C-alpha cells in the first residue's frame, strides 16, 4: 500500500512539474511576442525566448516561476495593444509595472482580453500618451478579475468620453489612482460612482479638471479620497460625503471651494487626516464638529478665510500630530488647551499669518514632541517663554514680525537640535546669549530689526552648518569677528545698520572653496528688495522665512510700510555649488568700518551682492575684487575711497554699481558695463571723470611736481598719438571701402560704420516737459525721441488716453511680467502698441531716461523698434510698432488668431529671424544685452511673418535683484528658465541661448513649453524631447509638418540638433548665438530644397539689419561654470 501511495505522489509531482514547465514555456512565448512587438529593440536587447522567462529584463521569480515584471522607466515606445495581448496574459505574474515606459495608444485595446489569473497590481502610470475614458478603466479592471491595485496616474484618462451603461465597474479594486489625468466632466465622476467606485478603499483623483462633487453612494468602504488640485467651485453639497463614514483621509485642497466649514465632515468620525487648504472657505470653525473628530492626526486649513478664535476642541484633539491654520484671519489668543495630554504627539504647529494676540502660552511648552513652531506675522506680545527650552525635539523656532520683547532666553540652548532661529522684526533687547553656542546644528539665525546690542559673538564661527546669518538693523558694536570665516557653510551674511567698527576681516573669505553641495535646502523664503534712495530703511533688502504666508499679507508689516521695498521674490533656500563654493550675499553697510577693503573678498567666486556702503573705508579699490566673477551688485558709496576705478572691473557683468560720494579720481573705464550706469552712481567724486560724468579735461593745470615727469613723457606721447592717428586713418579708409561695396539697408536698419552699437556719450535735444500734467492739460507728453529714426507726432496724454479708450480692456492685446499692452490708433491713422509698465517706484527719472535712450537707439529688422516713451509720476509708457499677427505663442499655439497654419518654411524663417535678433543683442551691442526672458510670447510676427524679438530691454529697467534673484519672475518664465538660474542669481547670454532652444523646440514640435496634459506634472517640453530622442526621434516633430511635406524630415533633424545644443545643461557647452547663426547657414548650404526656397532662406539669414554673420566672429569669452 505504501508503495502505491508513493507511486501516486510521484505522479502528482511529475504532473506538477509538467504543468509548471508548460506554464513557464507559455510565459516565455508571451514575452518573446512582446519583445518582437516593441519598436525600441535596444530596450530589451540581450534576451530571447530560449533564455527563459526569469532572465527577462525586470523579471522577478519565485520557485522558478515568473511572479513580477518591472519595466518602469524603460523607453519601450510600445502600443498598449501589444501589452494587452502579451504581458497582461502572463499566467503567474502578480505585479506588473510599466510606469513611465512610453506606452501609448487606447486603453480600449484591452477589450475582450483576459488578464492572467494571478495579477493583483498593475502600474501604467506616467504614460502621457495612454488615453481612454473612465469606462475603459472600468473595463480593464473587470478584465483583470483578481486585480486589487490599478495605477493610471499621469496618463490621459478622460481624453475620451464615457458612453452609456455601467458594467461591473470598479467593485473588485482596492486601490485606484487616476491622479493627474484629464477627467473633466462631472458626468465622468458620476459614471464612476454609478459603476461602484465608492467601494474602492483608496481613490486618488487629484490634479484633474473636475468641477463638482457628486453624491457618493455605497461608499462605506472608501477610506482615502483625494480630489485636490481640481476645479471644484462653490460649496460642498450637503450629503455628498455623508455615506462615506469609513473615510480616514479626505483631501479637497487647491480647489475653489467656498462657504462655511462643510457640515458633512462632522459625521466622518473615522477621519485621520483632513486637508481643506488653499480654498475660499470662510466663517468660524464649528467647535462641536471637531469634538466628534477625535481620531484626527493631521488638520490643514491654511490659505482660507476662516476667522474668529481657534476652538479649544481643535487645540485639544488627542491624536493630533500636525495642525496648520496658517494664512487665515484667526484672532484672539493661542488656545491654552494645546497639548493638555502629557503624551501629546503634536510635532507641527503652524499659526503664522493670522491676527493672533496675547502672549505665547505656557501650554506650548507641554508639546514636547514639537519639531516645528511657526507663529510669525501675528501680533503676539510679551516675552519668549524660557520654558520653550524644554522642547528638546524642536528644529524650527520661527517668531518673526510680532511684538515680542525682552531678552532671548538662554534656556533655548537646551534645544541642541535647533536648526532655524528666526526672530526678526520684534522688540527684543539684550545680547545674543553665549549659551546658544551649544546649538551646533543651527543653519539659519535671523535676529534682524530688533534692539539687540553688544558684540557679535566669535563662537558663531564654530557653527559648521550656519548658512544664513542676519543681524542687521540692531545696535551691535565692536569688530566683525574674523572667526566668521570659519563658517564653511555661510552663504548669506547681513550685518548692515549696526555700530560695528574696525576693519573688514580678510578672514571672511577663508570659507571660499571649502563648501559642500546642498548647504541650505528646502526652506521657503521671500526676498524684499529695498530701494535705499528713497527709503527710511537701509541695506539691499530683507530675507524672510516664508512658509505658508500669502505675499499680499506682507503689507501688514510696519517695516514694509516704512521701507520702500520695491519688489518681493519668493523661492526656496536650496543652493548648490559646482566648485569653489563661497558666500553669495555680503552686506556690511551703514556701520563705522574703517581701513582698506581686503582684496581677499575677490576670492569669493560665487559672491553676487556686496554692499560696503556708508562706512569709513579708505584706501584704493582692490582690483582683485574683479576675481569675484559672478558679482552682480557692488555698492561702495559713502566712504573715503581714493584712487581710480580698477580697469579689471570692465570684465564684470555688473547690473548695479554705486561708487558715489568717495574721493575717487581718474577716468571711468569705457569697456564693459561701467559706462552704462547713470551718473548718480559716480557723483561726488571730485577727481572722477568720463561718461556718464563730464569728460576728462586733460589740459587742466598740473602741479609743479608733475611737470618734469610729464615733460619726459611728451615725446613718447606724441609718437603714440601719431601712430594712433595713422591707424585711425587706415581704419577709416578700410571702412569706407567696405561700405561702398555693401548695398544700402532699409532706413529703419541704419547702422553705425562698424556694425556695433555703443551707448550714447551725448544727449540729443529732447522734449523736456515732465508729463506731470493732468488729463485736461494742453502740455505735450514727455516723449523722448533722441536718435529715434521716425519721430512721432506731438502727442498729449489725452491723445494716448483717447487712442486706447482710457486704456480700456477691449484695447488690451497682451499682458506680461512687465505690464499690459494696448493697441492704439493715433490721429494720423498710425497703429501702434503701447506698453503700460507696472509701477516701478524705485526707478528714478534719470535711470529710466538713460535706459530708454539706449533702447531707442537699437534698430534691427528682427527687433521690435521702440518709437517713443513717456513718464508721468510713477507711470511709464512705451510706444512700439504694432505687429499684426501678435506673438509666436499666439500664432503657433492658438491658430485661430490668424486663421492659418505655419508650414515649415514659415517656421524656419521665424527661427532664423529670432536667432538673428538675439545674436544682434549679444554680439553687436556693447555692452552686450542679455534678454533674460526669451520666449515665444516675446517673439512677435509682422505681416511678412518675419520674427521680431520684443522686451529685450525691459529687464534692465528693474533693479539688479529684479533680474538676479527672481527666476520665477523677471529672469525667466517656467519652461524657458535654464537649469543654472535655479542655482545662481546671475543671468548670462548662455541663459538666453537655452531659452532660444526652447523656442526652437516649440517650432519643431508645435507644443508649448509646459503642459501637464502632454508632459506630466514633473516634466516639460525639454524633458519630453530628451526622452523621445532616445527612441524614435522623429516622433517629436509636429505631425502637420511631415504630413504636409515628408521631404523636410532631414532638415527638421538638423534643426533639432541645434536646439539640443542650445539646451545643454552645461552653459559653457552651449553655442553662442553667432554660432547658432553659423549652423543655420551650414544647413542652408547643404540643403536639398529647391533653389527658390534655398535662396529665400539664405536671404533671410544674411540680410540682418547690421550684417550679423558678415561681421568678424568676435566670440564672447566663455562664461566659467
From Swiss-Prot:
Disruption phenotype: Dwarf plants due to the lack of internode elongation. Insensitivity to brassinolide.
First and last residues of every LRR repeat: 90-114, 116-142, 144-167, 170-193, 197-221, 223-243, 244-268, 269-292, 294-317, 318-341, 343-367, 369-391, 392-415, 416-439, 441-463, 464-487, 489-511, 541-564, 580-603, 604-628, 629-651, 652-676
Domain Protein kinase: 807-1083
Induction description: Down-regulated by brassinolide.
GO biological process: brassinosteroid mediated signaling pathway; detection of brassinosteroid stimulus; hormone-mediated signaling pathway; microtubule bundle formation; skotomorphogenesis
Alphabetic keyword roster: ATP-binding, Brassinosteroid signaling pathway, Cell membrane, Glycoprotein, Kinase, Leucine-rich repeat, Membrane, Nucleotide-binding, Receptor, Repeat, Serine/threonine-protein kinase, Signal, Transferase, Transmembrane, Transmembrane helix
Reaction catalyzed: L-seryl-[protein] + ATP = O-phospho-L-seryl-[protein] + ADP + H(+); L-threonyl-[protein] + ATP = O-phospho-L-threonyl-[protein] + ADP + H(+)
Enzyme class: transferase
Family, as annotated: Belongs to the protein kinase superfamily. Ser/Thr protein kinase family.
Protein name in the entry: Brassinosteroid LRR receptor kinase BRI1
Gene source species: Oryza sativa subsp. japonica (Rice)
Amino acid at each position: 500500500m505504501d508503495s502505491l501511495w508513493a507511486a501516486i505522489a510521484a505522479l502528482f509531482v511529475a504532473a506538477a512539474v509538467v504543468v509548471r514547465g508548460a506554464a513557464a514555456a507559455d510565459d516565455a512565448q508571451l514575452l518573446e511576442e512582446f519583445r518582437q512587438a516593441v519598436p525600441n529593440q535596444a530596450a530589451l536587447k540581450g534576451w530571447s525566448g530560449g533564455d527563459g522567462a526569469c532572465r527577462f529584463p525586470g523579471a522577478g521569480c519565485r520557485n522558478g516561476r515568473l511572479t513580477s515584471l518591472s519595466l518602469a522607466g524603460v523607453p519601450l515606445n510600445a502600443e498598449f495593444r501589444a501589452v494587452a495581448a502579451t504581458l497582461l496574459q502572463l499566467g503567474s505574474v502578480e505585479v506588473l509595472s510599466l510606469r513611465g515606459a512610453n506606452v501609448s495608444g487606447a486603453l480600449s485595446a484591452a477589450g475582450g482580453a483576459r488578464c492572467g489569473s494571478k495579477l493583483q497590481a498593475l502600474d501604467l502610470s506616467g504614460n502621457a500618451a495612454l488615453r481612454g475614458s473612465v469606462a475603459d478603466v472600468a473595463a480593464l479592471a473587470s478584465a483583470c478579475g483578481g486585480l486589487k491595485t490599478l495605477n493610471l496616474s499621469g496618463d490621459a484618462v478622460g481624453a475620451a468620453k464615457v458612453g452609456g451603461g455601467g458594467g461591473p465597474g470598479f467593485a473588485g479594486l482596492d486601490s485606484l489612482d487616476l491622479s493627474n489625468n484629464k477627467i473633466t466632466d462631472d458626468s465622468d465622476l458620476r459614471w464612476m460612482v454609478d459603476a461602484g467606485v465608492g467601494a474602492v478603499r483608496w481613490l486618488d483623483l487629484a490634479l484633474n479638471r473636475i468641477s463638482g462633487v457628486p453624491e457618493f453612494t455605497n461608499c462605506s468602504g472608501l477610506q482615502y479620497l483625494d480630489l485636490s488640485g481640481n476645479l471644484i467651485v462653490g460649496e460642498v453639497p450637503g450629503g455628498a460625503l455623508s455615506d462615506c463614514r469609513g473615510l480616514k483621509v479626505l483631501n479637497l485642497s487647491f480647489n475653489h471651494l467656498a462657504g462655511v466649514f462643510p457640515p458633512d465632515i462632522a459625521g466622518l468620525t473615522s477621519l485621520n487626516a483632513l486637508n481643506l487648504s488653499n480654498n475660499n472657505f470662510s466663517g468660524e470653525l464649528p467647535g462641536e464638529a471637531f469634538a466628534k473628530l477625535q481620531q484626527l492626526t493631521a488638520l490643514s486649513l491654511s490659505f482660507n478665510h476662516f476667522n474668529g478664535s481657534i476652538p479649544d476642541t481643535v487645540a485639544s484633539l488627542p491624536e493630533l500630530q500636525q495642525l496648520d491654520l496658517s494664512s487665515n484671519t484667526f484672532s484672539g489668543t493661542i488656545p491654552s488647551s494645546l497639548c493638555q495630554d502629557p503624551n501629546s504627539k503634536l510635532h507641527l504647529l503652524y499659526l503664522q499669518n493670522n491676527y493672533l494676540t496675547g502672549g505665547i502660552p505656557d501650554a506650548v511648552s507641554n508639546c514636547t514632541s514639537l519639531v516645528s513652531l511657526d507663529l510669525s506675522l501675528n501680533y503676539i506680545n510679551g516675552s519668549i517663554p524660557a520654558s520653550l527650552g524644554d522642547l528638546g525635539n524642536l528644529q524650527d523656532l520661527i517668531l518673526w514680525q510680532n511684538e515680542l520683547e525682552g531678552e532671548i532666553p538662554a534656556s533655548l540652548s537646551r534645544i541642541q537640535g535647533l536648526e532655524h532661529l528666526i526672530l526678526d522684526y520684534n522688540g527684543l533687547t539684550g545680547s545674543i546669549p553665549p549659551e546658544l553656542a551649544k546649538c551646533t546644528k543651527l543653519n539659519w539665525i535671523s535676529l534682524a530689526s530688533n534692539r539687540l546690542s553688544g558684540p557679535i559673538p566669535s563662537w558663531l564661527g564654530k557653527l559648521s552648518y550656519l548658512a544664513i546669518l542676519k543681524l542687521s538693523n540692531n545696535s551691535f558694536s565692536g569688530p566683525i569677528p574674523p572667526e566668521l570665516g570659519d563658517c564653511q557653510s555661510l552663504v548669506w551674511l547681513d550685518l548692515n545698520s549696526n555700530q560695528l567698527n574696525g576693519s573688514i576681516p580678510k578672514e571672511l573669505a577663508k570659507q571660499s572653496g571649502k563648501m559642500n553641495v546642498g548647504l541650505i535646502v528646502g526652506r521657503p523664503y521671500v526676498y524684499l528688495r529695498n530701494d535705499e534712495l528713497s527709503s527710511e530703511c537701509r541695506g539691499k533688502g530683507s530675507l524672510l522665512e516664508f512658509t505658508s504666508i500669502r505675499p499680499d499679507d506682507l503689507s501688514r508689516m510696519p517695516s514694509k510700510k516704512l521701507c520702500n521695498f520695491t519688489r518681493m521674490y519668493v523661492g526656496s533656500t536650496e543652493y548648490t555649488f559646482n566648485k569653489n563654493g563661497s558666500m553669495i550675499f555680503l552686506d556690511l553697510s551703514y556701520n563705522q568700518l574703517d581701513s582698506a577693503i581686503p582684496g581677499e573678498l575677490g576670492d569669493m567666486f560665487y559672491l553676487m551682492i556686496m554692499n560696503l556702503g556708508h562706512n569709513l573705508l579708505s584706501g584704493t579699490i582692490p582690483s582683485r575684487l574683479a576675481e569675484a566673477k559672478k558679482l552682480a551688485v557692488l555698492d561702495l558709496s559713502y566712504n573715503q575711497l581714493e584712487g581710480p576705478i580698477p580697469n579689471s572691473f570692465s570684465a564684470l557683468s555688473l547690473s548695479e554699481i554705486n561708487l558715489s560720494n568717495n574721493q575717487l579720481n581718474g577716468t571711468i573705464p569705457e569697456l564693459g558695463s561701467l559706462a552704462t550706469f547713470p551718473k548718480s552712481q559716480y557723483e561726488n567724486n571730485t577727481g572722477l571723470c568720463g561718461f556718464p560724468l563730464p569728460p576728462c579735461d586733460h589740459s587742466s593745470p598740473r602741479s609743479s611736481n608733475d611737470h618734469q615727469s610729464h615733460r619726459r613723457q611728451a615725446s613718447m606721447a606724441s609718437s603714440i598719438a601719431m601712430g594712433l592717428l595713422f591707424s585711425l586713418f587706415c581704419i577709416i579708409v578700410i571702412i569706407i571701402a567696405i561700405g561702398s561695396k555693401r548695398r544700402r539697408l532699409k532706413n529703419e536698419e541704419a547702422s553705425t560704420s562698424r556694425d556695433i552699437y555703443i551707448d550714447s556719450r551725448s544727449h540729443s535735444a529732447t522734449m523736456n516737459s515732465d508729463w506731470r500734467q493732468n488729463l485736461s492739460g494742453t502740455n505735450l507728453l514727455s516723449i523722448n525721441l533722441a536718435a529715434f529714426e521716425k519721430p512721432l507726432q506731438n502727442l498729449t496724454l489725452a491723445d494716448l488716453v483717447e487712442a486706447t479708450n482710457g486704456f480700456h480692456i477691449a484695447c488690451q492685446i497682451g499682458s506680461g511680467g512687465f505690464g499690459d499692452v494696448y493697441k492704439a490708433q493715433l490721429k494720423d491713422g498710425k497703429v501702434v502698441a503701447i506698453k503700460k509698465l507696472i509701477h516701478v517706484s524705485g526707478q528714478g527719472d534719470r535711470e529710466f531716461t538713460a535706459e530708454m535712450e539706449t533702447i531707442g537707439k537699437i534698430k534691427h529688422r528682427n527687433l521690435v523698434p521702440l518709437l517713443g516713451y513717456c513718464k508721468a509720476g510713477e507711470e511709464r509708457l512705451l510706444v512700439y510698432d504694432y505687429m499684426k499677427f501678435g506673438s509666436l505663442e499666439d500664432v503657433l499655439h492658438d491658430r485661430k488668431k490668424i486663421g492659418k497654419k505655419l508650414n515649415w518654411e514659415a517656421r524656419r524663417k521665424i527661427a532664423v529671424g529670432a536667432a538673428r535678433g538675439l545674436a544682434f543683442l549679444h554680439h553687436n551691442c556693447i555692452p552686450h544685452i542679455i534678454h533674460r526672458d526669451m520666449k515665444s510670447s516675446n517673439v512677435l510676427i509682422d505681416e511678412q511673418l518675419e520674427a521680431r524679438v520684443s522686451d529685450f530691454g525691459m529687464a534692465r529697467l528693474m533693479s539688479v535683484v529684479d533680474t538676479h534673484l527672481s527666476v520665477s519672475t523677471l529672469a525667466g518664465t517656467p519652461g524657458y528658465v535654464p537649469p543654472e538660474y535655479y542655482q545662481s542669481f546671475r543671468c548670462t547670454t548662455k541663459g538666453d541661448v537655452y531659452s532660444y532652444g526652447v523656442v526652437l523646440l516649440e517650432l519643431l514640435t508645435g507644443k508649448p513649453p509646459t503642459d501637464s496634459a502632454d508632459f506630466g506634472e514633473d516634466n516639460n517640453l525639454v524633458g519630453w524631447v530628451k526622452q523621445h530622442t532616445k527612441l524614435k526621434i522623429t516622433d517629436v516633430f509636429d505631425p502637420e509638418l511631415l504630413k504636409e511635406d515628408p521631404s523636410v524630415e532631414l532638415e527638421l533633424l538638423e534643426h533639432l540638433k541645434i536646439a539640443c545644443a542650445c539646451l545643454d545643461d552645461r552653459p559653457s557647452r552651449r553655442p553662442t548665438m553667432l554660432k547658432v547663426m553659423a549652423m543655420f547657414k551650414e544647413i542652408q548650404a547643404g540643403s536639398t530644397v529647391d533653389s527658390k526656397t534655398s535662396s529665400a532662406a539664405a536671404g533671410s539669414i544674411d540680410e540682418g539689419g547690421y550684417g550679423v554673420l558678415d561681421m568678424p566672429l568676435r566670440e564672447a569669452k566663455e562664461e566659467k561654470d
